[in-house]
Amino acid sequence: MISVKLSKRFKKTVRSAGREQEVSETLKLVIEGFGNSHAHTGLSIRKLGRHVYECRTGLAWRLVFVADKGVLSFDFAGDHDEIQNYLRGKR
């Protein structure tokens, strides 16, 4: 069973963008399909680094999460440029 953690930053970003419903639906699909490559092809889950992944909620918005021992920790959400800036700051 996979569990999910949402950071304060993630929750705040999603809330301020008004994308709660969209993100909630995507999180359900990620929980169901993570680790099963055929199930998550529609979500566009991509590995960005060691244990770091992103998935799309739509064409323009993405969610960044860390996968570690059955826990998916979502830390950031945004468009392509925002994700790139976030990842540069993580290195």
Locations of regions flagged by a protein language model:
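Alpha-helix capping and helix-coil boundary motifs
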Residues: 16, 37-38, 79
